[in-house]
């Protein structure tokens, strides 16, 4: 009672002291003027929108209640040019005014302390009208007393004498309850004089003054935000409806209110609120789409109330001034009112309360309400009453801001009676289905926009309506025959409906898809394709939606189908990540300000059911060794991105459960989502994985790449950079170094911090340069400042041990438009082993050798322990804004491919019809109320169509000759819509300004492909299909527009009469070609659209092609390309190629046939596809080149029609392993019979390098390197009689360079090696290459054409104008004046980075001084293959060349390990391939492929000379040191003789199996292109080279060839030797003809001499705390063990009865295992009880495993006393 009395006294005091702004008994009439317009800003001054005018009457009943009425309302639509801006005054005479359809019913304004707290309206007043009333009444909200002021130090408090104020307040208006900056100041007489409309009744100031109140709203800080948004998943700083969105979006609202008299008692003279919304329509547009609104109230009169407004019938509170949601599907007004609203009991029925007692009662009642609401937790972030109810699976969501939902009087358009949503959807589906068959005109029909309209319409449909629509269409895919052309419209109808349902994204749509799958309507790949898109399209993934998805996932029809199970599982987990785990995505991607959080924070299904289910499935797949399913569940768990997954991955990553390296690598790679949601946690785990040097490089490199996504601290980057100098794994070091150096170059804000750190640690990296085949990370960006676009590309790949092809490739690219990221496109390709793929997948059974080869026998004698082939596993993933596709595979799946391909070929033999359509959308929506109470709507939509229809017929022969005939219509179409506008619900209008762009490609082609692989022929024939002679093949357009759209008219905007495209005044059209041709191009755009015309510039086009979205701007453009044929084209375009080769024989290859000068040869047969010409040119190409092999390519292009032409191009060239000579011949002929135009070009060129290939530097010391070449070009109508260009060139080594090279350390080291008898080790190989450097070029050209000379001279003149070139020109006395000759001389400087170039022409002489090679894209490395510090050049030699040398006393392996060598009389395996273990059968060894059965053996005689055996397949080549300077050669036991002029070749079926030839003075060479090996020897030393195909596939004295020199001493037993002599002896063949030291050492070898190779070892990389367990690791660490530290724990207690299980609502203090209670006490605990069902038992089991679920929000079932420990000790 005392409290009540105190409150009464306080309330009375407040009431007595407060002076009301509204004089009781007075009536105020205000003129209401508002306008809301939209336009494209500077792009056009055309605006479209609506103007409203009305009268507002306000009657002051008492200090807390105002009665009001809006009446005499009128509105007019406008769509016109406003050169003076959107505020241009428009007289009523120029407007078509209509009555505003408002009810005109009176309403109440509830006040408190002079501020508007609530609007009381008639319950029957439409919600759209209520929101407009709020926008009007909101103009009267003036807080001059700081009632809602935020108390901060910066507040400026006004006084009566100095009415200056500045403060911030949290204030509600129709746009939301947001922070408002108040500025109050007196209004000067000058301003009033200049703008008298501000003070329409100046006498009202009395003794006071006129004052101006400025309110600026801060939309970044709001307590109640009203908006609907969808589709911005990748943006971290996005807050829809605010200004935190970079240049993409900005929003402002400013109010100017003029009051008279004083701040405590005043009259509002005028109030104007101006609001502006600016959006980049397509995100990257430079011009903004605008929505501009203004609400203006001006006092018209003030008088005593003569006729009081009637009381409000059926009153209802609307909460506050904030926009209010309603149920768009209800027949009555169901509004969502916040808790602050008064209930019906609080709404006093007497509108004329006047007694102070009643006022006090009301104030106390309000005060009580405020006290209770402030202490209540009802309006938590979990649930707010003003939000719409969460969507159900059966019903469409209540989206109260989107056009189709509020477009008809605030209700969904189906309420209009004019739109039957079912029939309208059906009609749209049939329209689209029919238009898909007129693919050429898809842009004209606006088919893609119709599909978007269909999707939006279906989002308003409930489950029953969708079922009725499906039934009405009478389309069942099970009844469709996919190969029946007569059903093409029905097929299109089904695919349109299917894709529309997929894109709809509502609960009813999902139930439809679920039903399709359960009843088998969609199966396998079609169902998988649908499921893969759902996470991208779902609008409201509520807990019930996800629960239903989970039930579908467990359905056998899904789980038993591999492709469907993979797609569904990954989609389910991606949806969980977006909707439940990733807070950024939860907020940015879904309409949380409309429905609140879609999944309750207290929903533990993710932890109790979803993750455990996936964990069980992973464990089951692991037990069954089902690799595709293992990969699926690894990716699925990683896709969730929740820390809980670490506990699932832990046993596998730490080796407690064995997984393959590939699977562990995928597991680490799947942590990418965790790096986004919890970067610190992910960083810790990834860093520990990286530090484990015993882990495989694939796993570690993947960890490195992901680690960079977590923005590691500087100290961590420093550690990693330093560690590159210590880590022995080149793959990992290469990944770290390349990634850090790539990061250094980035400048964009996103990478700025990490780039700065990378630059600071760069100096700590190892200086070693790594090959590009090793693991690398690249990050590239392109910044387009003028378009506010930054494009990013990330490429990571992990190298292979057994191939140059990476095992893992990850590529992603995305663009940032301001701060808005467009969803990225990611591509991932992984394979466990390239060699396994080659061995097990690409080779057919007949290609595998069945007899034991010589190499296998040697491997058996050496008892080589083979490695098991890595099990073949792999996957391919594509993830973009439309779908996520993941295809895991293993050997068993690949084994099925040949059968599948064979079945497909069999199916298309008869040319069956196909019709495949795919429609996809990417959508983003933002909507919120404007300050005029009308919904603002922004949409960004991308609609894409891919279509293939027609027939394919194929015939394939066993010898890979095949014929394919097809009649196909291929279509790709894309429509991008960026639209800004607002909705007027009372007249079902949507006013829009936007930019639409279209890209359309159509190819209706009849194609015939004939490939004859044995003969090397291929021919394409291409015709346009019949009936398509005038078809549109290409369309591109950008159309800015404004539109006054009737929402009930479900037609594309381009077909609306209210749409006005912004065609520029200087628009012009261009048609090409001017004359008739097979194609016609029409271009339409503005003359001033320079960017469009600049695309003709090849350089700018090339620069923009990688980023095609930057090629357009906002200006109008339209490009169409048509076929322009008069009738059916019966003759095809023919493109044919022929390839042939020829092994040249004597006498053609005799050296005397080589001529020092090459002459262009005119073929005797110039017809297309001439075998005679090909043979002639091959013979000429190989003439005079020893052991040459010639090749020829013959191309023919025939174009029929009016401009018939025949083009022939033939190129022939030769190569030789024996001589350093080469020749190239070319013939080009163009014939156009109808125009009698023929043209020919004949080219002949040759090159010769001397000395020829040398291996030993001592052979080179006295020889001068040089290169001679010449080119002969003849051209004209007949090249035999036409003009000629003759070019001769020489490259030489200057004496200066020779002297410089001779003084380098490389040469000196080689000389020292030669003194010890070692002449071919790597040092001397470098010396040979270094000594062959050429630095002088001299070229002379005979040019008879004056035009060509003039053109060349003009080019020189243009070069001279380049700023960074130092050029001197002499035109007065040119050296070649009067001659038809051009000379070019160039000389490199001593550092080989600059050149002096002198050019002499008949017109001028030019001297280019110190030309930097880098300016022209060349580097020193392009000139050299090696370098030395003496030349100031580094890293030119590849340190890991694929060569192995056995020199006089030392050897070097393939991987560069150097060791002393002494062979003795025993044969030793220098290099041999060996069989592998079949991973599917550990007892079986796989045979070595026939073309990889290679062994090289060597031994020494008493003189220290080396005898060598080479076993290539079934051939045996033996090299025996001879009495002369070169070894004797035996092939299969038969002695052969080779000399400088005579080589030996073994040829089978025009293929050289191997050839033997002389190299230099004393070396013999052997090369086999078939086996990819080569050998050079001189009787004392041997050099062996092998291709990358042998990587990690050989053993012997040359090492294991895995590009890692640390393990080169691997012995036959797969262990490592320490001592070189042990390693050498281990490869001795001791079974026969073996004696001496090698035999003794080999026999004495013990097991301890050979160390077993350490296999990969996993370690503890996930701690207890990181896996979510109780941290027990810290308790035993350190010198001072705190055994009691973790004795006290908290555990949820469980009590079980017969029918219930009860859980403590909060964890209870307990003693840990191994600890006991020292002291106890009793304490009451609340329990929540559940029925004993499956859910309760699952929760119990989870608690028993250590979980402590949060049950604090559950209802209390009972309270019991528990005895709990007070102190626990171990």
UniProtKB/Swiss-Prot annotation:
GO-annotated cellular components: extracellular region
Superkingdom in the source lineage: Eukaryota
Cysteine pairs bridged by disulfides in the record: 178-222, 1444-1598, 1466-1634
InterPro entries for the chain: Lipid_transp_b-sht_shell, Lipovitellin_superhlx_dom, Vitellinogen_b-sht_N, Vitellinogen_open_b-sht, Vitellogenin/Apolipophorin, Vitellogenin_N, VWF_type-D
Signal peptide: 1-16
Main location group: secreted
Glycan attachment points: 296, 1067
GO MF terms held by the record: lipid transporter activity; nutrient reservoir activity
Record domain Vitellogenin: where: 22-809
Domain VWFD per the UniProt entry, residue ranges: 1442-1635
Gene3D superfamilies reported in the protein's UniProt record: Lipovitellin, beta-sheet shell regions, chain A, Lipovitellin-phosvitin complex, chain A, domain 4, Vitellinogen, superhelical
Protein's job: Precursor of the egg-yolk proteins that are sources of nutrients during embryonic development. Involved in the differentiation of honeybee larvae into queens.
Pfam families: Vit_open_b-sht, Vitellogenin_N, VWD
Record protein name field: Vitellogenin
Tissue and organ distribution: Accumulates in the hemolymph. Represents up to 70% of the queen's hemolymph proteins. During the first week of the worker adult life, when it becomes a nurse bee and performs brood-rearing tasks, the vitellogenin titer increases and may account for up to 40% of the total hemolymph proteins.
Description of what induces expression: By MRJP1 during the differentiation of honeybee larvae into queens.
Keyword Chaperone among UniProt keywords: no
Keyword terms of this UniProt record: Disulfide bond, Glycoprotein, Secreted, Signal, Storage protein
Compartment annotation: Secreted
Key word Disulfide bond present: yes
Ranges where the record places region Disordered: 373-394
């Amino acid at each position: 009672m005392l409290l009540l009395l105190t409150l009464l006294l306080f309330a009375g005091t407040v009431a007595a002291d407060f002076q009301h702004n509204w004089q009781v008994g007075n009536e105020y009439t205000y003129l209401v003027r508002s306008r809301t317009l939209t336009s494209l800003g500077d792009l056009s001054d055309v605006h479209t929108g609506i103007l409203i005018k009305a009268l507002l009457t306000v009657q002051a009943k008492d200090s807390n209640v105002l009665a009001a009425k809006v009446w005499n309302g009128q509105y007019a639509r406008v769509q016109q040019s406003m050169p003076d801006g959107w505020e241009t005054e428009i007289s009523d005479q120029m407007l078509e005014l209509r009555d505003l359809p408002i009810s005109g019913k009176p309403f109440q304004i509830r006040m408190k302390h002079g501020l508007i707290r609530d609007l009381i309206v008639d319950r029957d007043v439409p919600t759209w009208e209520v929101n407009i009333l709020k926008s009007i009444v909101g103009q009267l909200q003036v807080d001059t007393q700081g009632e809602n002021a935020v108390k901060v130090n910066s507040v400026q408090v006004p006084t009566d004498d100095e009415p200056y104020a500045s403060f911030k307040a949290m204030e509600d208006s129709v746009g939301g309850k947001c922070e408002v900056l108040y500025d109050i100041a007196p209004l000067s007489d000058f301003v009033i004089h200049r703008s008298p409309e501000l003070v329409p009744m100046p006498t009202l100031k009395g003794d006071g003054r006129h004052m101006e109140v400025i309110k600026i709203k801060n939309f970044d800080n709001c307590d109640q935000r009203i908006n609907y948004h969808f589709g911005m998943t990748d943006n971290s700083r996005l807050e829809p409806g605010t200004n935190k969105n970079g240049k993409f979006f900005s929003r402002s609202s400013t109010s100017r209110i003029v009051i008279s008299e004083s701040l405590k008692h005043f009259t509002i003279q005028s109030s104007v609120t101006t609001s502006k919304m600016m959006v980049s329509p397509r995100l990257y547009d430079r011009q903004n789409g605008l929505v501009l609104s203004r609400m203006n109230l001006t006092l018209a009169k003030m008088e005593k109330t003569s006729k009081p407004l009637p009381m409000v019938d059926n009153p209802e509170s609307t909460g506050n001034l904030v926009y209010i949601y309603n149920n768009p599907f209800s027949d009555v007004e169901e509004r969502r009112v916040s808790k602050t609203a008064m209930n019906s009991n609080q709404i006093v029925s007497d509108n004329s309360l006047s007694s102070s007692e009643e006022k006090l009662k009301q104030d106390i009642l309000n005060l009580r309400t405020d006290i209770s609401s402030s202490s209540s937790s009802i309006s938590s972030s979990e649930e707010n009453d003003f939000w719409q109810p969460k969507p159900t699976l059966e019903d469409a969501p209540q989206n109260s801001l989107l056009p189709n939902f509020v477009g008809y009087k605030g209700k969904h358009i189906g309420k209009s009676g004019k739109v039957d949503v079912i029939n309208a959807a059906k009609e749209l589906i049939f329209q689209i289905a029919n238009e898909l068959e007129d693919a050429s005109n898809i842009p004209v029909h606006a088919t893609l926009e119709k599909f978007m309209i269909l999707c939006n319409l279906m989002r308003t449909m409930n489950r029953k309506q969708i079922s009725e629509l499906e039934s009405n269409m009478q389309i069942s895919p099970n009844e469709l025959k996919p190969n029946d052309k007569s059903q093409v419209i029905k097929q299109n109808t089904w695919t349109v409906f299917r894709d529309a349902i997929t894109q709809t994204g509502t609960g009813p749509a999902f139930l439809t898809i679920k039903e399709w799958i359960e009843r088998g309507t969609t199966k396998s790949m079609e169902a998988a394709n649908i499921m893969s898109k759902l996470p991208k399209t779902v609008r409201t993934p509520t807990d019930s939606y996800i629960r239903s998805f989970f039930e579908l996932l467990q359905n056998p029809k899904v789980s038993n189908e591999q492709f469907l199970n993979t797609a569904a599982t990954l989609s389910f987990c991606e949806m969980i990540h977006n909707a439940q785990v990733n807070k950024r995505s939860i907020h940015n991607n879904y309409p949380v300000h409309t429905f609140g959080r879609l999944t309750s924070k207290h929903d533990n299904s993710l932890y109790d059911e979803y993750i455990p289910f996936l964990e069980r499935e992973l464990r089951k797949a692991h037990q069954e060794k089902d690799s595709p399913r293992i990969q699926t569940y690894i990716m699925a768990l990683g896709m969730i991105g929740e820390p809980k997954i670490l506990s699932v991955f832990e046993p596998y990553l730490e080796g407690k459960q064995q997984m393959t390296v590939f699977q562990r690598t995928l597991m680490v790679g799947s942590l990418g989502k965790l790096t986004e949601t919890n970067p610190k946690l992910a960083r810790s785990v990834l860093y520990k994985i990286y530090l484990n040097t015993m882990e495989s490089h694939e796993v570690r490199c993947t960890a490195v790449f992901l680690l960079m996504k977590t923005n590691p601290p500087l100290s961590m980057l420093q550690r990693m950079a330093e560690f590159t100098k210590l880590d022995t794994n080149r793959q990992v070091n290469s990944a770290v170094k390349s990634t850090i150096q790539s990061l250094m170059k980035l400048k964009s804000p996103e990478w700025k911090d990490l780039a700065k750190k990378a630059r600071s640690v760069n100096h700590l990296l190892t200086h070693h340069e790594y090959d590009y085949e090793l693991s690398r990370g690249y990050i590239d960006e392109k910044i387009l400042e003028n378009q506010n676009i930054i494009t990013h590309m990330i490429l990571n790949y992990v190298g292979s041990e057994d191939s140059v092809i990476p095992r893992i490739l990850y590529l992603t690219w995305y663009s940032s438009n301001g701060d808005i990221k467009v969803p990225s496109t990611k591509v991932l390709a992984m394979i466990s082993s390239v060699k396994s793929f080659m061995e097990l997948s690409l080779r057919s059974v007949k290609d595998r050798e069945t007899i034991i080869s010589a190499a296998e026998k040697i491997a058996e004698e050496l008892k080589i322990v083979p490695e098991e082939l890595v099990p073949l596993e792999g996957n391919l993933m594509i993830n973009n804004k439309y779908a996520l596709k993941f295809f895991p595979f293993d050997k068993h799946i690949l084994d099925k491919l040949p059968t599948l391909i064979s079945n497909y070929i069999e199916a298309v033999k008869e040319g069956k019809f196909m019709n495949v359509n795919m429609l996809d959308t990417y959508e983003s929506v933002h909507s919120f109320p404007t300050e005029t109470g009308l919904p603002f709507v922004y949409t960004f939509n991308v609609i894409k169509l891919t279509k293939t229809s027609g027939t394919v017929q194929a015939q394939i022969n066993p010898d890979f000759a095949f014929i394919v005939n097809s009649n196909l219509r291929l279509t790709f179409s894309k429509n991008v819509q960026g639209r800004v506008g607002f909705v007027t619900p009372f007249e079902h209008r949507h006013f829009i300004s936007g930019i639409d762009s279209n890209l359309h490609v159509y190819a209706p082609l009849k194609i015939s492909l004939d490939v004859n692989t044995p003969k090397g022929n291929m021919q394409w024939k291409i015709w346009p299909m019949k009936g398509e002679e005038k078809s549109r093949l290409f369309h591109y357009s950008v159309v800015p527009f404004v539109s006054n759209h009737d929402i009930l008219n479900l037609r594309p905007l381009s077909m609306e009469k209210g749409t006005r495209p912004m065609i520029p005044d200087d628009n012009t059209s261009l048609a090409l070609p001017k004359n008739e041709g097979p194609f016609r191009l029409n271009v339409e755009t503005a003359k001033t659209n320079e960017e469009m015309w600049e695309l003709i510039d090849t350089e700018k086009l090339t620069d923009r092609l990688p980023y095609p979205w930057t090629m357009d701007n906002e200006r109008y453009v339209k490009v169409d390309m048509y076929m322009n044929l008069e009738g059916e084209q019966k003759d095809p375009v023919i493109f044919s190629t022929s390839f042939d080769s020829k092994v040249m024989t004597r006498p053609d290859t005799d050296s005397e046939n080589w001529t020092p000068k090459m002459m262009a040869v005119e073929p005797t047969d110039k017809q297309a596809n001439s075998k005679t010409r090909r043979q002639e040119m091959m013979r000429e190409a190989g003439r005079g080149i020893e052991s040459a092999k010639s090749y020829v390519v013959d191309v023919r292009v025939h174009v029929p029609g009016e401009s018939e032409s025949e083009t022939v191009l033939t190129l022939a060239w030769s190569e030789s392993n024996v001589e350093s000579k080469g020749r190239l011949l070319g013939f080009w002929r163009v014939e156009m019979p109808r125009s009698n135009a023929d043209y020919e070009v004949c080219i002949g060129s040759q090159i010769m390098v001397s000395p020829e290939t040398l291996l030993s530097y001592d052979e080179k010391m006295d020889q001068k390197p040089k290169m001679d070449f010449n080119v002969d070009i003849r051209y004209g109508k007949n090249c035999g009689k036409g003009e000629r260009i003759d070019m001769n060139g020489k490259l030489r080594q200057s004496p200066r360079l020779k002297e410089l090279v001779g003084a380098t350390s490389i040469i000196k080291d080689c000389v020292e090696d030669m003194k010890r008898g070692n002449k071919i080790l790597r040092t001397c190989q470098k010396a040979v290459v270094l000594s062959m450097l050429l630095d002088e070029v001299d070229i002379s050209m005979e040019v008879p054409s004056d035009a060509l000379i003039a053109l060349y001279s003009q080019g020189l003149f243009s070069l001279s104008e380049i700023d960074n070139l130092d050029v001197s020109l002499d035109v007065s006395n040119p050296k070649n004046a009067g001659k038809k000759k051009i000379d070019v001389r160039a000389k490199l400087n001593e550092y080989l980075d600059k050149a002096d170039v002198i050019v002499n022409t008949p017109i001028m002489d030019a001297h280019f001084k110190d030309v930097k090679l880098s300016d022209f894209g060349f580097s020193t490395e392009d000139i050299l293959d090696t370098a030395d510090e003496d030349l100031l050049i580094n890293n030119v030699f590849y340190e890991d060349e694929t060569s192995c040398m056995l020199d006089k006393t030392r050897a070097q392996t393939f991987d560069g390990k150097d060791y002393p060598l002494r062979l003795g009389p025993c044969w030793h395996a220098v290099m041999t391939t060996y069989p592998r273990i079949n991973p599917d059968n550990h007892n079986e060894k796989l045979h070595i492929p026939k073309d990889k059965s290679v062994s090289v053996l060597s031994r020494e005689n008493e003189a220290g000379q080396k005898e060598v055996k080479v076993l290539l397949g079934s051939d045996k080549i033996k090299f025996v040191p001879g009495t002369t300077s070169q070894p004797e050669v035996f092939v299969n036991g038969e002695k052969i003789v080779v000399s400088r002029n005579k080589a030996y070749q073994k040829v089978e079926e025009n293929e050289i199996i191997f050839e033997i030839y002389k190299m230099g003075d004393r070396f013999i060479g052997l090369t086999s292109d078939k086996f990819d090996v080569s050998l050079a020897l001189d009787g004392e030393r041997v050099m062996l080279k092998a291709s990358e195909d042998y990587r990690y596939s050989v053993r012997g004295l040359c090492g294991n060839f895995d590009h890692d020199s640390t393990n080169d001493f691997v012995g036959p037993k797969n262990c490592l030797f320490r001592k070189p002599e042990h390693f050498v002896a281990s490869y001795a063949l001791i079974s026969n003809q073996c004696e001496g030291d090698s035999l003794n050492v080999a026999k004495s070898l013990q097991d301890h001499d050979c160390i077993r190779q350490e296999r990969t070892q996993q370690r503890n990389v996930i701690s207890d705390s990181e896996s979510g367990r109780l941290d027990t690791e810290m308790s035993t660490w350190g010198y001072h063990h705190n055994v009691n530290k973790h004795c006290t724990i908290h555990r949820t207690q469980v009590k079980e009865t017969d029918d219930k299980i009860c859980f403590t609502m909060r964890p209870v203090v307990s003693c840990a295992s191994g600890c006991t209670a020292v002291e106890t006490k009793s304490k009451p605990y609340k329990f929540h009880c559940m029925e004993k069902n499956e859910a309760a038992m699952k929760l119990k089991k989870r608690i028993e495993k250590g979980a402590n679920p949060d049950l604090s929000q559950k209802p209390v079932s009972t309270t019991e006393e528990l005895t709990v420990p007070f102190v626990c000790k171990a």
